Amino acid sequence: MVLLAGTGPEGGGARCMTPPPPSPPRGAQVEEDPADYEEFEDFSSLPDTRSIASDDSFYPFEDEEEHGVESAESVPEGVPESVPETATLLRAACANNVGLLRTLVRRGVSVEEAQETDRNGRTGLIVACYHGFVDTVVALAECPHVDVNWQDSEGNTALITAAQAGHAIITNYLLNYFPGLDLERRNAFGFTALMKAAMQGRTDCIRALMLAGADVHARDPRRGMSPQEWATYTGRVDAVRLMQRLLERPCPEQFWEKYRPELPPPPEAARKPAGSKNCLQRLTDCVLSVLTPRSVRGPEDGGVLDHMVRMTTSLYSPAVAIVCQTVCPESPPSVGKRRLAVQEILAARAARGPQAQEEDEVGGAGQRGRTGQEDADSREGSPRAGLPPALGSRGPAAPAPRKASLLPLQRLRRRSVRPGVVVPRVRVSKAPAPTFQPERPARKGSTKDSGHLQIPKWRYKEAKEEKRKAEEAEKKRQAEAQKERRTAPWKKRT
């Protein structure tokens, strides 16, 4: 898991503070100065609040939400924006000018402008995928006229270009947020995106394409070789091992909603008692364990390390549930199964209607209630998938833009303890002066009339204390009497 933290508006979160004023004298009434505290209600301005939790699922930045969802409100009508006359969508994409690109998209782009190509027949999306311009690809996703399956003069699409170049983030973004993407589109030589990634040894792109449903058994028309055979032919050992591993275990079971983080049952060999082996077998096992180096053994399938990886990468893991959100926990990715884009999944749920969504939620709640208290506690803070009720009321007739799937985090937290959006208010106090001495509260002489609890007094302790005081008084009286008897007679006469 890779976290890419963005820089804050003040340079990595550094905050310049003025030196604190001198501390007031003791005993003086001190009033709270509003300048001594800073209250934060919008956490988007703080540093380290923008992150990409994974390459294939992440929320957009705040400015992307404003441009993608509230574009009509952010740009007033009748106010022209400063855009050069020669600026086009293709030039802005080639120059990686994200600000100009978003401005052009908000103002409206025709089909001819969106499909403008260079001398090699490449559109702005293909150029951005070739150079690895992630922000440009995200900005082009807002344009409704961009053809994701456009082929250049050599027949390469945006997906083939990104997979061949090894841009894993762009490849995952194309697979997740561009509806209608053709995974099996071939170029002029008959190669698919998976074949090109296998030839170049792009393991991250191979994993993303195979889990998205790319055809592993497809063959090119000239040599008739599959992607795995092309990886073997070009000497990509890591790619061959990865593809073989994915074919052996095509579906990650920890991404299922029904997955339980339980230890696997022990194998049959471990269940047999030690006394079932004879002397020769035990001697052979002892010699083999001594002569075999333990460092050579790798992680075993179904072992402790494998179980730890499954638990930490599951949907209900604390490391994943607090930063990631999935829209289809009931259908995890699998090799050979076509995975739909986020917009297509949300459109299918919206077409079912709010009543079907409520039935799914009720059924999921009943299923969660049967899992036990431990599973309920582990899932209490995990984000759940599903369309919010506000989106379900729109109906299938409402046009779903591409950025509509990237919902704000507060709109997806529908199972919170408090209803609605609860924004905490953080109050940060400044550090006092080095010479400041806190004033200690004066102790009260008696606590009889106070509202606090008092220490209980036991009767035997009170009697013991009274007896001790009486003995001390008797000793003092006897000492005074003895002192008077020792006084000289001539002093008494006077």
Curated annotation (Swiss-Prot):
Biased composition annotated in UniProt, kind: Acidic residues: 30-42
Swiss-Prot/TrEMBL keywords: ANK repeat, Coiled coil, Phosphoprotein, Repeat
ANK repeat residue numbers: 84-113, 120-150, 154-183, 189-218, 223-255
Pfam family, one: Ank_2
Entry keyword Repeat: yes
Keyword GTP-binding: no
SUPFAM superfamilies: Ankyrin repeat
Region (Disordered): 1-80, 349-494
InterPro entries in UniProt: Ankyrin_rpt (IPR002110), Ankyrin_rpt-contain_sf (IPR036770)
Biased composition (Basic and acidic residues): 371-382, 440-451, 459-487
Full protein name: Ankyrin repeat domain-containing protein 33B
Gene transcribed to yield this protein: ANKRD33B
